[in-house]
Amino acid sequence: MTTIGTPLRPNATKVMMLGSGELGKEVVIELQRLGVEVIAVDRYENAPAQQVAHRAYTISMLDGAALRALVEKEKPDFIVPEVEAIATATLVELEQEGYNVVPTAKATQLTMNREGIRRLAAEELGLKTSPYRFVDNLEDFKQAVAEIGIPCVVKPIMSSSGHGQSVIKSEDQIQQAWDYSQEGGRAGGGRVIVEGFIKFDYEITQLTVRHVNGTSFLAPIGHRQEDGDYRESWQPQAMSDLALKRAQETAERITTALGGRGIFGVELFVCGDEIIFNEVSPRPHDTGMVTMASQELSQFALHARAILGLPIPEIYQISPAASKAIVVEGKSNNMTFGNLDKVLEEIGTNIRLFGKGEVNGHRRLGVILARDENTEKALAKAERAYAKLAVQL
């Protein structure tokens, strides 16, 4: 039987979030609704999840000693990584000492870089993937591009939100792609993956939740990427029964191999009825923000339940829905969001502003959510709302 204590009391049920971005913020809110005491950690102060947590700490989570000291100080019941840039070797040690890492330290370690998860998927599980090479230097990079062929995709093995990712469409872009990959890695320059360019009909996120009663699947989420970063998503994505069955089978195989409890974002390419594995995140997925409009229990609420060992009897979809990321470009630490009365004037429209303190370049600062009778209308509604938003830097 699962029990939950009282926050800020000796019997509190404590969760430590490692990473405090917009996805972590929603998880913190859901955990607090269940009476959980939450500690939010990030590498910079006043990150979104830190703004709604009971306590916040700012450290380099790649510093194993600092991470261990913080865990030993707080003694959380659950450690929940929300980003890739973490000292995963320390998490493995902490798990061996009895701490509960969500979903598992192994899952966090394997998925913190693209090499670990790609080798698990392709070489151990035999899942279909794009052709790939891993390289450490410019000379090997040029050779890998020659072997894979142009066009090809280049990504740092450790990055997120499209940072350091590019598509090589001609030979004169090889040096530029290498330089960009070295600037965009979460832990600095270094190893990259060169992937063959996949021709696909569409791509989906198959959100999969492993919980106390087994494994459940959310309706597939379609999405559009730009520069390797999510811009729009919608749920459900129309697909054949066979393709959906294969997507769920692929998702179950990879999440079973990773183990533990929680939500996983399994990224897949779909070509006809064929499924090609791309990546997996052992945490809520940015494209899954649409579930805040589409489902009775969002991906964040499902993650909170799974972490705590609470039952998930059914995943119920309220309505077709869409999301559109609010991406701002410029430089400011004093942003203002205006014209909200117009943004929210249509029924079934909502907005989430993440509370990020600054932008320097381009940054996702919020998301528009919309419901309608089908995903096409929901997406059009979200785009209309987005067009009315005025962001002043």
Swiss-Prot record:
Keywords: ATP-binding, Ligase, Magnesium, Metal-binding, Nucleotide-binding, Purine biosynthesis. Mg(2+) binds at E267, E279. SUPFAM superfamilies: Glutathione synthetase ATP-binding domain-like, PreATP-grasp domain. GO terms for biological process: 'de novo' IMP biosynthetic process. Residues 119-308 form the ATP-grasp domain. N(1)-(5-phospho-beta-D-ribosyl)glycinamide binds at E22, L23, E82, D286, K356, R363, R364. Its EC number is 6.3.1.21. GO terms for cellular component: cytosol. Pathway: Purine metabolism; IMP biosynthesis via de novo pathway; N(2)-formyl-N(1)-(5-phospho-D-ribosyl)glycinamide from N(1)-(5-phospho-D-ribosyl)glycinamide (formate route): step 1/1. It catalyses: N(1)-(5-phospho-beta-D-ribosyl)glycinamide + formate + ATP = N(2)-formyl-N(1)-(5-phospho-beta-D-ribosyl)glycinamide + ADP + phosphate + H(+). InterPro entries: ATP-grasp, ATP-grasp_carboxylate-amine, ATP_grasp_subdomain_1, PreATP-grasp_dom_sf, PurT, PurT/PurK_preATP-grasp, PurT_C. ATP binds at R114, K155, S160, S161, G162, H163, G164, Q165, E195, G196, F197, I198, E203. PROSITE patterns: ATP_GRASP. Pfam families: ATP-grasp, PurT_C, RS_preATP-grasp-like. One of its GO terms (molecular function) is phosphoribosylglycinamide formyltransferase activity. Belongs to the PurK/PurT family. NCBIfam families: PRK09288.1, purT. Homodimer. Involved in the de novo purine biosynthesis. Catalyzes the transfer of formate to 5-phospho-ribosyl-glycinamide (GAR), producing 5-phospho-ribosyl-N-formylglycinamide (FGAR). Formate is provided by PurU via hydrolysis of 10-formyl-tetrahydrofolate. This is Formate-dependent phosphoribosylglycinamide formyltransferase. It comes from Actinobacillus pleuropneumoniae serotype 5b (strain L20). The gene is purT.
